[in-house]
From Swiss-Prot:
Keyword Aminoacyl-tRNA synthetase recorded: yes
Signal peptide: none
Localization: Cytoplasm
Entry binding sites for Mg(2+) 1: E408, E415
Reaction equation(s) it catalyzes: tRNA(Lys) + L-lysine + ATP = L-lysyl-tRNA(Lys) + AMP + diphosphate
Assembly mode: Homodimer.
GO terms classed as biological process: lysyl-tRNA aminoacylation
Top class in the EC scheme: ligase
Binding site for Mg(2+) 2: E415
Protein name: Lysine--tRNA ligase
Organism (species): Legionella pneumophila (strain Paris)
Residue ranges the record marks as coiled coil: none
PROSITE patterns: AA_TRNA_LIGASE_II (PS50862)
InterPro entries tied to this protein: Aa-tRNA-synt_II, aa-tRNA-synth_II, aa-tRNA-synth_II/BPL/LPL, Lys-tRNA-ligase_II, Lys-tRNA-ligase_II_N, Lys-tRNA-synth_II_C, NA-bd_OB-fold, NA-bd_OB_tRNA
Amino acid sequence: MSEEHVHLDESEVYHIRKQKLAELRTSGFNFPNTFRREHLADALLKQYSETEKQTLEQKHVKVSVAGRIVLRRIMGKASFFHIQDVSGRIQVYLRSNDLPDVYEQFKHWDLGDIVGVQGELFKTNTGELTINAEYVELLTKSLRPLPDKFHGLADQELKYRKRYVDLIANEDSRKTFLIRSHLIKAFREFMDDNHFLEVETPMMHPIPGGALARPFVTHHNTLDMTMYLRIAPELYLKRLVVGGFERVYEINRNFRNEGISTRHNPEFTMLEFYQAYADYNDLMNFTEQLFHYLCDKVLATRQIEYQGQVIDFNKPFERLSVKEAILKYHPDIKAQQLETLEGCRTLLNDLGLPYKETDGLGKLQIILFEETVEHQLFQPTFITEYPTEISPLARRSDTNPEVTDRFEFFIAGREIANGFSELNDAEDQAERFRKQVEEKDAGDLEAMHFDSDYIEALEYGLPPTAGEGIGIDRLVMLFTNSQSIRDVILFPHLRQ
């Protein structure tokens, strides 16, 4: 029975295919692993698509390909079918006269089965590059049907839960994750070319630190101690700068026990790097160069369409302080209103934005910025002069100790990167840790712990340093025009 021409539910198809597999086993089929592929579909198409039909016949090009059957047309004593590999699809022509035994078996194979094919390239009368099959072998029997006659998964959540099916059925999904891979490779190339050393730091920390976030908690049985999945590698990377590795970077996972949204996943990938004898201005310049490189290398353009609008990486990236950004996007607000607790509270009350009575001036300014301005920063924009109150690891500004030499980098209304001149004064850092502990004791679950070992490392001397973290998942969203972070993470977290 051919399921392609009869409407069957998935359980019926599964049962029929199980029977087919049982019959195959009795004839000696054992999921063979001796076929060796020598060519990819896309490479063959690129090399021979423009070759004239007669010229191709004269060349007698022999190929060996393998992939999944995704389309087939059985026409009496001859059939066409398409196989799909990681690079794309190519057509195969199989004749009963050439391979009578295989052809009889082929009629009972199904969409989704994986085959190996050897043969000679030719072009059909319509000009399609095709393999004239001289050898065909079933390599894997597929027991479950491809979705929706191979037009893709309609259920968005099912795409996330069964990514393996999504990747089979959805070319756009495959392209998304290929771009992700190319992007990470380009990050590494740029960092290596700029003399940064790639390192690996612990994923389980005895003390959570490096960011304001709620950690995942676990327990080390042998050591009998509480451990935390890392929320950021920052403090370990800066220890390495203390140790003499003056330019370091790491691409790895961070874990934050927080909400899930179109922009947040509890497990996410970041590039984090540190450079001695540099400040946050140097890093902003470096970031512009980095993004130019990424655009050129991965997309071959510096203008990217995202959700119907164009992001222009060619223009100099705008730089605004937190206060300047608020005033730019709120022309009705006076600068003096941002300078007092009373003024900021009034603004937040008028806008219906909640805050705590214990929030300081800097925190109130940030609430106003994040809730009303951030989403409007569509073109690449650096926001600088973050309040010291919310920047416990950043160096204070020499001109205004209430703010830090820190920036956040925004594109399409979301934070893509965070960087600053590092605080290398051990006594100042210890005092800020103490304030964080006070906030934690007062109920702030995201406040930092006091890391005495990190303070000791600073006491050995951290050179003037700047560091930055870049969210790779969010950047992949931009480069692939994806609306949700779940579209760019292979296996995102979902409710059971």
